[in-house]
């Protein structure tokens, strides 16, 4: 029996697509190769950081990254080799690091950030239970130059709160005097991504959405301009519409005769317990070393580092040690109790713009990938966009696809 909608991928984007499609009255089946308990979305920092914060590729980032590489504090680590796509990615990254591109991207971030915030509110109204706080993002600066640069962008709209070192310590008690100050971006929020994922899974299962866990899609069958069959290692599944939301795994994208300019960026996190009085009062980002520190219900999580051009899925202890060393330079000594280390791959485009929309060849295939480190930030918005697109029937009929998809961005 042909299924109505098949979503391939059970991360935050896949589940958000399933949620929005279900809300429109569709019968949905989610196929996920793992057991759905520990994917990349679970290891996310949990930031909903769409507001007043620049994308990864922005003016000055190339020189700043080179400087940080000399200190072993760079957010990006490149494993150089004979991979042409890596060099294409780097060139596009450098090309995107200009004021015009950054201004446009930040405007889009705001538009779809609010869409995600609305979606999270709706999830909570639907009875989902997850840690969700709209208490801003604290941008902590360790370089005077970058702190002054950020202050110049602040206005009197209420979206910014400039803090000196003493005031910063009220929000982040463990910082030391090596920091320069901070800016609280008041519109941002944060969640516990694991709780979001589990709540979405439970809600969708109770709503009748079908989940095929531990079932890996290995190929497709094509007929004319349609995908006629989704081939898993267990069976062949037919569907009226297929949403491909497989994150950093390029294998299935290539099966559809596509090769997006996107790299699997390996990121790291450490989740631990610490005394309540020392925990950050809100989500925080050490902006100059690209390290997030996020409070949760019972724990704290730090996330950092993006490695490009590696397939090694094991935790690199050197990277973990480097994260701790970088953090220790700007904090008072404290103990990470019951620490859990994690790594995973994020689908990173060079300009933070995802690949969204109907496939150019196969009329029943929709792509939803490329959010990189912004999955939790924009996942719910992407779900809404993709669901609306499925009704519109064509990319050109959907303004959000035209605005926010890499298919329509130079």
Predicted regions and their residues:
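C-terminal catalytic lobe of FAD-dependent flavoproteins
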Residues: 287, 331-410
């Amino acid at each position: 029996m042909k299924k109505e909608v098949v979503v391939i991928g059970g991360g935050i984007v896949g589940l958000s697509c399933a949620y929005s499609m279900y809300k429109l009255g569709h019968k949905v089946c989610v196929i996920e190769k793992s057991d759905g308990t520990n994917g990349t979305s679970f290891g996310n920092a949990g930031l909903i950081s769409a507001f007043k914060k620049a994308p990864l590729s922005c003016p000055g980032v190339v020189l700043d990254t080179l400087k940080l590489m000399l200190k072993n504090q760079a957010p990006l680590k490149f494993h150089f080799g004979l991979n042409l796509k890596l060099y294409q990615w780097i060139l596009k990254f450098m090309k995107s690091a200009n004021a015009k591109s950054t201004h446009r991207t930040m405007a889009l971030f705001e538009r779809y950030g609010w869409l995600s915030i609305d979606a999270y509110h709706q999830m909570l109204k639907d009875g989902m239970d997850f840690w969700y706080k709209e208490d801003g993002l604290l941008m902590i600066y360790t370089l005077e130059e970058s702190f002054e640069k950020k202050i110049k962008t602040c206005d009197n709209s209420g979206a910014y709160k400039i803090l000196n070192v003493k005031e910063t310590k009220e929000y982040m008690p463990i910082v030391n005097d090596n920091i320069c100050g901070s800016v609280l971006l008041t519109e941002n929020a944060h969640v516990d991504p694991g709780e979001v994922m589990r709540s979405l899974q439970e809600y969708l299962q109770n709503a009748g959405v079908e989940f095929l866990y531990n079932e890996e899609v290995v190929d497709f069958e094509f007929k004319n301009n349609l995908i006629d069959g989704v081939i898993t290692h267990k069976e062949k599944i037919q569907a009226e519409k297929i949403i491909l939301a497989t994150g950093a795994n390029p294998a299935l994208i290539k099966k559809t005769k596509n090769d997006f300019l996107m790299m699997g960026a390996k990121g790291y996190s450490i989740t631990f317990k610490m005394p309540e009085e020392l925990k950050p009062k809100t989500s925080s980002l050490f902006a100059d070393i690209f390290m997030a520190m996020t409070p949760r219900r019972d724990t704290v999580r730090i996330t950092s580092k993006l490695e490009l051009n590696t397939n090694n899925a094991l935790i690199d202890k050197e990277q973990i040690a480097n994260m701790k060393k970088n953090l220790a330079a700007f904090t008072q000594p404290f103990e990470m109790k019951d620490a859990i280390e994690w790594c995973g791959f994020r689908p990173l485009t060079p300009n933070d713009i995802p690949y969204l929309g109907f496939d150019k060849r196969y009329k029943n295939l929709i792509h939803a990938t490329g959010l990189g480190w912004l999955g939790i930030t924009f996942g719910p918005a992407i779900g809404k966009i993709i669901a609306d697109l499925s009704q519109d029937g064509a990319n050109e009929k959907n303004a959000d696809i035209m605005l926010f998809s890499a298919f329509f961005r130079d």
